């Protein structure tokens, strides 16, 4: 009623799509470059991004926390204002050494006490589809490093992490 909700919506407007396409059946859509090209020709379409968004669990130094991972292309960072929202570290999804890197929300980073150190990987965990029980040992894990910390608003800061699209694909294929 005092306009604060408008300020919150504006703060995440560049990373929240105006149009989202979901599959009619199932959870996934195969990326079709010809279809994406056709969609891109529609008047008013500025950018098209394939995003894998899934709930996962992260593990760091013995702490475990659920988050929402957004697997995005490197172009996503340049075409949104994500790099302007970085409050620590950098805005990249692959380290200069070629390692997987993540950009974490401020709340996630603070809660997990994440560090910019190569010797302390962050484990991105997703249920192994071949496992027959629910436990930490039944999770597929990908090691990643902290590249940066962003701050949009409390809701996003407390639950979202960005990773390379290929990391999202690898997690889901486990």
Task: Annotate each PLM feature.
Residues 27-34, 59-61, 77-82, 98, ...:
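Solvent-exposed, non-transmembrane alpha-helical starts
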Residues 72, 80-121:
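Extracytoplasmic segments of membrane-associated envelope/inner-membrane machinery
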Residues 14-16, 62-67, 97-101, 117-119, ...:
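Extracytoplasmic
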Residues 9, 41-44, 110, 114, ...:
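Short, intrinsically disordered, mixed-charge
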Residues 22, 37-39, 63-68, 82-90, ...:
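Generic alpha-helical propensity signal that fires on short helical segments
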Residues 1-68, 74-78, 85-97:
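Hydrophobic, regular-secondary-structure patches
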